């Protein structure tokens, strides 16, 4: 039995002493997941998955159900917090080279894809105008698949258009996928603690480890408290800050807003989709915008794990973050000049990161060890 397992048995999870606040987002994500499951359960009790009643049932939850407005707002704002935490969590993994723990990184990528699917299904459920159009646009992308596209789309819709069967199955999927997220999270954590967490230096932590409790657990509690405080402040003062005004109208297939946009946390992928004037090409780019994370562990060329001592790669990393923000911003704008060209340029820069990064690693190796 290894030293790590002996310490685990005596309730002392060994963790590197120098891990920073960026390592707290895992526990914050777990808190978000628990919040979402609890509030989601209470919302599901009162929700009706029927196109004629769904919108009214959400209004009923907000107006008539005791504390229903709290449940609904925590669930809606909690989803945004969930994505803020997960994007920071992924950025931390990219910056400090944590993707070299391949099993953890790949299980995390699977988690991200499952989470995005769950959030998309959840966005459709209130059956507001933007919910309906987001569902129409995204599910319609299946038709881009050669030969099978139309059949798959009709199969997913449960008919020849988005209708009652579509809403029912989306509700069923939105209910069941969080349990898949719990399972994947467990696998993610088990795989992580198989080797132990890394640290900002990217070196082996074995020589300097301290127990998780009380040293790091109190730090976790502080960040969780700050996050929940932010959640309650937003819920109390600006509960509709992140909602689309179009979604306050019941879905009407005969009306189309000026431009369709999903929730803010999908805007970067939607912006990439929109920047390519071809249905199949756009769909492929949309999938690759997330799936490209799978390639990162296999294209690492630098002798140094962390970006902490790699100034050239740091510039590239912060370019990626800026690009992510710019794509998100352009996706909120109508499809017109100059937003089309900005989207296209930033999309190219976004994907370039994953090509230039291994080349820069190789160049830095030559500079450090000529």
From Swiss-Prot:
GO BP terms in the entry: mitochondrial electron transport, ubiquinol to cytochrome c
Binding site for heme b b562: 75, 174
GO annotation, cellular component aspect: mitochondrial inner membrane; respiratory chain complex III
Top-level taxonomic group: Eukaryota
Residues binding heme b b566, per UniProt: 89, 188
Residue numbers binding a ubiquinone: 193
Membrane topology (UniProt): Multi-pass membrane protein
Subcellular location: Mitochondrion inner membrane
GO molecular function: metal ion binding; ubiquinol-cytochrome-c reductase activity
Free-text comment on the cofactor: Binds 2 heme b groups non-covalently.
SUPFAM superfamilies: a domain/subunit of cytochrome bc1 complex (Ubiquinol-cytochrome c reductase) (SSF81648), Transmembrane di-heme cytochromes (SSF81342)
Keywords: Electron transport, Heme, Iron, Membrane, Metal-binding, Mitochondrion, Mitochondrion inner membrane, Respiratory chain, Transmembrane, Transmembrane helix, Transport, Ubiquinone
Cofactor(s), by name: heme b
Further remarks about this protein from its record: Heme 1 (or BL or b562) is low-potential and absorbs at about 562 nm, and heme 2 (or BH or b566) is high-potential and absorbs at about 566 nm.
Similarity comment: family membership: Belongs to the cytochrome b family.
Function field: Component of the ubiquinol-cytochrome c reductase complex (complex III or cytochrome b-c1 complex) that is part of the mitochondrial respiratory chain. The b-c1 complex mediates electron transfer from ubiquinol to cytochrome c. Contributes to the generation of a proton gradient across the mitochondrial membrane that is then used for ATP synthesis.
Record note on quaternary structure: The cytochrome bc1 complex contains 3 respiratory subunits (MT-CYB, CYC1 and UQCRFS1), 2 core proteins (UQCRC1 and UQCRC2) and probably 6 low-molecular weight proteins.
Protein name: Cytochrome b
Species assigned in the record: Bungarus fasciatus (Banded krait)
């Amino acid at each position: 039995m290894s030293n790590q397992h002996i310490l685990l048995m005596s309730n002392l999870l060994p963790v590197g002493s120098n891990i920073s606040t960026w390592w707290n987002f895992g526990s914050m994500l777990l808190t978000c997941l628990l919040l979402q499951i609890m509030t989601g359960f209470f919302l599901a009790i009162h929700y009706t998955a029927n196109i004629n009643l769904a919108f009214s049932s959400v209004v009923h939850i907000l107006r008539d159900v005791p504390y229903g407005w709290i449940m609904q707002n925590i669930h809606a704002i909690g989803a945004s917090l969930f994505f803020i935490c997960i994007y920071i969590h992924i950025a931390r993994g990219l910056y400090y080279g944590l993707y070299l723990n391949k099993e953890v990184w790949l299980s995390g990528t699977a988690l991200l894809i499952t989470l995005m699917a769950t959030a998309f299904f959840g966005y459709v459920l209130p059956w507001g105008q933007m919910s309906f159009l987001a569902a129409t646009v995204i599910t319609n992308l299946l038709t881009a698949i050669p030969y099978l596209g139309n059949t798959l789309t009709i199969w997913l819709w449960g008919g020849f258009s988005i209708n009652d069967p579509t809403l029912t199955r989306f509700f069923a999927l939105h209910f069941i996928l969080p349990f898949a997220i719990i399972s994947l999270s467990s696998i993610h954590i088990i795989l992580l603690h198989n080797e132990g967490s890394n640290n900002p230096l990217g070196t082996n932590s074995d020589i300097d480890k301290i127990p998780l409790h009380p040293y790091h657990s109190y730090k976790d509690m502080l960040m969780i408290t700050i996050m929940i405080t932010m959640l309650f402040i937003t819920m109390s003062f600006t509960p509709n800050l992140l909602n689309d005004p179009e979604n306050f109208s019941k879905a009407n297939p005969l009306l189309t807003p000026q431009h369709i946009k999903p929730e803010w946390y999908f805007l970067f992928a939607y912006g990439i989709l929109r920047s390519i004037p071809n249905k199949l090409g756009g769909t492929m780019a949309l999938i690759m915008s997330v799936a490209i994370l799978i390639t990162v562990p296999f294209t690492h060329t630098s002798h140094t794990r962390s970006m902490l001592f790699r100034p050239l790669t740091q510039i590239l990393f912060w370019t990626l973050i800026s690009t992510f923000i710019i794509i998100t911003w352009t996706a909120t704008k109508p499809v017109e000049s100059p937003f089309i060209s900005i989207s296209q340029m930033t999309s190219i820069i976004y994907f370039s990161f994953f090509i230039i990064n291994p080349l820069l690693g190789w160049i830095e190796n030559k500079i450090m060890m000529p």
